[in-house]
Amino acid sequence: PKGLVGSEMCIRDRPSGANIFFEMAKDYTKMVEEMSGGELKIDLQPVGAVVKTSEIGQAVSSGALDMGHWVTAYWYGKNPAASLFGTGPSYGLSSQEVMGWMEYGGGRALYEETLSKVGYDYVGFFHMPMPAQPFGWFKKNVTKVADVKGMKYRTVGLATNVLTAMGMVVRQLPGGEIQPAMKTGLIDAAEFNNPT
């Protein structure tokens, strides 16, 4: 940022989950500081330090946070189109196809329109598209559709409607809450974008 010469800027950021994604966020903040010659620093906050995962968009929009990293599917309840910009269920576009659609097929314009309809006031940077979600991890074997009826299952986005129609009890939880929810019995099974 050549326009920042002689001044230092610190931006507060909050990623939406722990594990490998937090490690990638730490690497990103380090690269930004190095590339700006130390003039731009990102104060990376751990999960829950400022707001809950489900509140990141509102926190950035209101100015409580300068930036945040989260999955648009987490605001599926505000507008179902939000799920088009994250990982889909275990069918659909590959990561490369999603990026192609975003950049060359009208996806970015639809994203901006959806963002406006939801009422968020920020600029989104689309990155790290994940492949289609695996069906998940289960406490018991699933060998036929009847096995999932009544099962408490964690997912987000478009899969919510599909799996509810199959008879599952869907809970939309952030990634960082999956493991505790499995241990306490809040859910019987879960999907997450990859096995990290």
Feature-to-residue mapping (PLM):
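Periplasmic binding protein-like
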Residues: 53-74, 180-196
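Alpha-helical hinge/cap motifs
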Residues: 7, 37-38, 149-152, 167, ...
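Short helix-initiation/N-cap motifs at beta->coil->alpha
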Residues: 44-58, 156-158, 170-184
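Gly/lys/ser-thr-rich phosphate-binding loops in alpha/beta enzymes
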Residues: 31-65
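Single conserved hydrophobic/aromatic residue that forms the stacking wall/gate
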Residues: 1-11
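Solvent-exposed, acidic/flexible segments
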Residues: 14-25, 49-53, 104, 152, ...
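Short, polar/charged alpha-helical segment
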Residues: 18-43, 161
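Contiguous mixed-secondary-structure segments that line small-molecule binding/active-site clefts
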Residues: 26-33, 61, 66, 71-152, ...
